[in-house]
Structure formats: structure tokens, C-alpha cells
Amino acid sequence: MNKYLEYPEVESNRQPAKKLVVLLHGVGSDGHDLIGLVPYIKNDLPDCHFISPHGIEAYDMMPYGRQWFSLQDRSPHIIAKLIANNISKLEDIIKQKQEELNLTNKDTIIIGFSQGTMIGLYLTLIQREPFFCTIGFSGALIPPMEVNNKLTPICLIHGELDEVVGVSEMYNASNYLSKLHIEHSGHKLTSLAHSIDGRGLEIAINFINTCHTVV
């Protein structure tokens, strides 16, 4: 098996799965991090199969961990180029699992944290077929050169005390999405730093359960 296709996953409570949830971790972590959220949300999403891929690259600022792209240079145009270079590998991971489960983009939910949000939002905006929905925790939006998808609803969740990725990035993302008339919501959580808490998970669950398939 391709090394990129080896990752932790959790089957849906009900079979066959009707939705695929793709969890995208932050820089320096790996897929085992966000898969740890599944026990807290699985029962509220009984038809969802969860996968948590590892970042495409080894983390280049520490001897352990993974990354979706390097953050050595944080210039937006450099980051956009790095994401564009790696995005096809993430798409391959998702497409293979979709084929295994007989699902498509319209059945797929993207959930990212921090750097995972950055690549998850980018991935969402370049799709020809929209995802079911996308959720971004504590991240930022790096615009692609071309936006193909304006139909996937997006939920942004951010701690007001975040010192890693400031909450201003949520507002920047919201402004960008508003200009494109993309349906989205933003949630600033009080007393929360760069993390995911129970409030954020509840918002995410409610968002998923109120979304409808884009025709």
C-alpha cells in the first residue's frame, strides 16, 4: 500500500457508511491526534466513517511529526504554491476511500485543525464537485488561484485567546468567503486558546446535522 494511504480510521456505527469524514491535523502532529476526537462525536454521527490521514511530508522543524506543507516561509503566496504542489496527494487519499465506501464528494465532510484547516479550505474551494460540508478549527484561509466550488457550506470555529493563529484569521476568512457569496458561519469561543473543546465539537456536530446535500 502507498505509504500515504496508511492512516487511522474508525468505521461508522451503522453500515454501510453514508458519509466520509476526513480529519486533517495540524503541523507537527499526525493522524493519530484528531482520530482521538472520534469517540466524542461518533454517536451523534452514526452514519459517518472517519479517516485521519497523516500529513504528506515529515515535519521539517522537528525530528518527529508530519506536515501538509512547510511553514519555513509563511508568505501567503509561498504557502499557496506549497499547498498546490501537495494537494493532489491528499485528493488521492480521499478518492481511494470514497471508492472503497461507494461515496463521492457530496457525501464527504472535511474537518481541519490549524494547518489542517488551511489545506482543508483550499481543497474545498478547488473542487469541481462540492463536498457535503467543511469545518475549520483554529486555522486560516489561503486562497487558491482559481475557485471552482462556491457551494460547500463552511463552518469556522476559533478560540478568542489563540496566540498561534489569531482569531483575526477567522474574520479574514469570513470576509473572503462573503465576497464570493459562499455560505458560511463563524464562531468565536471565549476563554479558548489554540485548541478544540467540547463547545466547538457541539457546534461542529450541529452544523453537520443541519447541512443538506448540494444538488
UniProtKB/Swiss-Prot annotation:
Top-level taxon of origin: Bacteria
Residue stretches in coiled coil: none
Annotated keywords: Hydrolase
Transmembrane found in the keyword field: no
Active site residues of this protein: 114, 162, 194
EC number, UniProt record: 3.1.-.-
Pfam families on file: Abhydrolase_2 (PF02230)
MF GO annotations: hydrolase activity
Keyword Hydrolase appears in the UniProt entry: yes
Record family assignment: Belongs to the AB hydrolase superfamily. AB hydrolase 2 family.
Protein's name in the database: Uncharacterized hydrolase RF_1189
Lineage summary: Bacteria, Pseudomonadati, Pseudomonadota, Alphaproteobacteria, Rickettsiales
